Amino acid sequence: MENYPETQFIPGDSMIQNAIVSYSEESAGRERRTEANNVSASQERQALSRFGGVPQMQNIGQDFGSWRDQASDRNGFQLMSAMAGATGILQTGQGLSLSLGSQILPGIHQISHQNMAPRGNEYATQSFPGGNQNLDVVRTIPNSKYLKAAQQLLDEAVNVKKALKQFQAEGDKNNENPQEPNQSTQDSSTNPPADISQSERQEMQSKLTKLLSMLDEVDRRYKQYYQQMQIVVSSFDVIAGYGAAKPYTALALQTISRHFRSLRDAISGQILVLRKCLGEQQDGSDGKRVGIISRLKYVDQHLRQQRGFMQPQAWRPQRGLPENSVLILRAWLFEHFLHPYPKDSDKIMLARQTGLSRGQVSNWFINARVRLWKPMVEEIYKEEFTENDSNSSSENTPKMSEIGPVAADDEDRAREFSQDQTKPDHGHGYGEETRGMVQGSHMDGRRFMAVEPTYHVADTSRLGRGDVSLTLGLQNSQGQDNVVAMSSEAYNNFSGVDIYENAIPGDEMEYVNPGSRQNRINSSQLVHDFVA
């Protein structure tokens, strides 16, 4: 048995002392360590046999030594495979042998040659995640059953060759017939739309508005469907990964888009036909521009109508029409103030300007004529009447100034009359008892007055408007004083100067004598008495 010098050996000592060493030196040190381990294991077995140890301990020592050797070999292979994975040499998955030195054992070389490929593949997948997956995708795409359908969808949606061919064909047609647009414009100008009655035009306009609303509804529904499909696609992508929903949703989206496109094209064709009938699209070259302008007009009108018909909120009820609409309607009312009754064409025009309906416009004018127009007209007439009254009063003031002196003259005459009554009359045979006013004689609420027939009755203006009778002293047979009674109706007709001109009607006079004898005096008898 050979004796080896005892040396204190620590596994991995060389790696700790010098971290930067060559791979050949490391393998040589590993060989020395394995030999030393074998020697130490044999020495331990001898010591155990001397002390009468259990025979199973030999097997334990052998197992421990073999496990330690395998662990050291595994560490070496891991280092080699890590270096190969870092440099990218083992990406192809083939075996590769490295010459690490002249002292390498053949067993180690064979083990490394056998285990190199799988170790390299493991580290290749760890260092490049998705590398093999990309290769798998590249291999599976040509063999996929969805490839043909996807190619067809792409050809239908984006086909560069077909688009180029169509563009070239259109260019050739334009080059061959460059005067076609001019001819179409001439045809449209020379062939204006036939005369259409007002009712037919209104019907066509209503159809046009309905078709435009249908077109907007189709666009809105398609946008809604597209948004819902996008939500479904995003949910698929979150659960199954990016692009998982394309095979399921692309075909459905394409089919629905075709359906909406065909429906939209049909509605657009009907709209173009109606516009041509109405004469809105007159120029063929500017057809797109005219269509865009008419479209903008329709959108503007639609927005105004939506503002007009906008449903008010429950807590803030809408009162009346919008302010802009009311201003337009008021302007028209004041422009046509003398005749504020719009025609049907005026109502349609105002409805377009205000964004209201024809019924709303007519109702507003009905209310405005009652609430605005009629009070204003009444105020105007009232002002005119007040001006006329003021002018008439200013004209009547000088007449009253002329009447003033006449009344003064009457007062002077009355004074003279009273003075003459107090004087004795020598020219007549009447006594003083028949002169002047008779006081104290009242009969049935009537007042009597005895006046000589030669005197003018000028002082009657002082009497009131009650029942009044006049007694005139007349010469009659029997030599008695007779009086004539006058009723109040006859007296009421006397005023100022008229008393001298108007004759007393005979049927309203009575002949009264002091003996309570009454006889009606006819007009002829009165004349006879006055003459006598």
Swiss-Prot record:
Q: Which SUPFAM superfamilies match?
A: Homeodomain-like
Residue ranges for the region (BELL domain) are 200-271
Looking up SMART domains in the UniProt record yields:
HOX, POX
Q: Which organism is it from?
A: Arabidopsis thaliana (Mouse-ear cress)
Q: Which gene encodes it?
A: BLH6
The feature table lists the DNA-binding region at 314-376
Show the GO cellular component annotation of the record.
nucleus
- Record text about domains: The SR/KY and BELL domains are responsive for the interaction between the TALE/BELL proteins and the TALE/KNOX proteins.
Cellular localization per UniProt: Nucleus
Q: Mind telling me which InterPro entries this protein's record contains?
A: HD, Homeodomain-like_sf, KN_HD, POX_dom, TALE_homeobox
**Keywords annotated in UniProt:** DNA-binding, Homeobox, Nucleus, Transcription, Transcription regulation
* Family of this protein: Belongs to the TALE/BELL homeobox family.
Give start-end positions of Basic and acidic residues composition bias. 412-434
Q: Where is the signal peptide?
A: none
**Subunit structure and binding partners:** May form heterodimeric complexes with TALE/KNOX proteins. Interacts with OFP2, OFP4, and OFP5.
Chain segments carrying region SR/KY domain: 144-160
Disordered: region residues: 170-203, 385-434
**GO molecular function annotations of the record:** DNA-binding transcription factor activity; transcription cis-regulatory region binding
Where is there biased composition of kind Polar residues?
Answer: 176-197
**A Pfam family the protein falls into:** POX
State the coiled-coil residue ranges.
none
Q: What is this protein called?
A: BEL1-like homeodomain protein 6
What PANTHER family has UniProt attached to this entry? Answer: HOMEOBOX PROTEIN TRANSCRIPTION FACTORS
